[in-house]
């Protein structure tokens, strides 16, 4: 099933607004709508400014609840650190009060992983500024921070994130991506591996056993966060009502 086109409404038919917060743009889509909207983010955008822009763009949309994919660590639905590429002030921001609706916050990689999931055990790796990661096993989501694990002389994301791409060039970077995927596959033994993120397009081919993700799956993941009957998500590691 294509969750974006069908809106993943499920049996509960809840109307959801999914917000994908990025370092350069914020993208939004609501259940029942076909065309995502976006606006520029950047280092000067605060959480309050983001909310104001979203309200403006989504003024004519109807929705009951909100999902936010956040570009940083989230624990128990609470943002742990301000994002590197946005203005400070996100950690204690009350999104529920600001929007006037129930809100669930997850790491952006976790939200895209939810939208990419087809069953069994799936590892999602987001090749972006860093290395986003999440694992789903039989419908239970576990956001991860694999990018910070030691690798060679630094960490995984130092080699396969944007810094690695810029430092080593495309050819070496691709080799590191293949090596990292092979190592994580051996360690975690997933049935399915999805490579997403903005830099996945820099790969000439997919590593063995991998499929390419679609950034639009972040919206599908946002819709799925509020589904109750056909998708069981373990929010202990990454989602909670705020």
What are these regions (language model features)?
Residues 26, 90-93, 97-112, 121, ...:
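Glycine-rich phosphate-binding loop plus the immediately following alpha-helix
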Residues 70, 127-129, 197-198:
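Short secondary-structure boundary segments
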Residues 16-20, 65-67, 122-126, 194:
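Short glycine-aspartate micro-motif
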Residues 184-216:
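Glycine-rich phosphate-binding loops at beta-strand->alpha-helix junctions
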Residues 28, 68, 195-197, 222:
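Residue-level signal for inorganic ion chemistry
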Residues 4, 8-52, 140-167:
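Short glycine-rich, Thr/Ser-proximal phosphate-binding strand/loop in the N-terminal lobe
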Residues 42-55, 59-67, 72-121, 158-160, ...:
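Glycine-rich phosphate-binding loop and adjoining helix at the ATP-binding site
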Residues 26-30, 72, 114, 131-136:
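Short beta-strand scaffold segments in enzyme catalytic cores
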């Amino acid at each position: 099933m294509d969750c974006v086109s069908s809106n993943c409404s499920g049996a509960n038919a809840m109307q959801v607004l999914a917000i994908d917060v990025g370092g350069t743009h914020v993208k939004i889509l609501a259940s029942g709508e076909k065309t995502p909207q976006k606006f520029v983010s950047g280092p000067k955008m605060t959480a309050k400014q983001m909310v104001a822009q979203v309200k403006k763009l989504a003024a004519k949309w109807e929705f009951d609840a909100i999902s936010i994919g956040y570009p940083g660590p989230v624990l128990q639905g609470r943002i742990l650190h301000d994002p590197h590429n946005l203005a400070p002030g996100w950690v204690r921001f009350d999104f529920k009060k600001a929007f006037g609706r129930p809100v669930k916050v997850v790491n952006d990689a976790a939200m895209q992983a939810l939208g990419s999931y087809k069953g069994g055990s799936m590892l999602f790796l987001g090749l972006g500024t860093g290395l986003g990661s999440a694992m789903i096993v039989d419908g239970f989501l576990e956001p991860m921070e694999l990018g910070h694990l030691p690798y060679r002389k630094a960490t995984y994301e130092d080699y396969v994130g944007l810094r690695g791409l810029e430092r080593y060039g495309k050819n070496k970077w691709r080799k590191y991506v293949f090596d990292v995927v092979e190592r994580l596959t051996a360690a975690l033994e997933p049935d399915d591996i999805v490579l997403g993120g903005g830099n996945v397009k820099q790969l000439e081919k997919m590593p063995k056993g991998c499929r390419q993700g679609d950034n639009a799956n972040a919206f599908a993941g946002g819709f799925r966060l509020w589904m109750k009957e056909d998708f069981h998500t373990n929010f202990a590691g990454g989602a909670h009502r705020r």
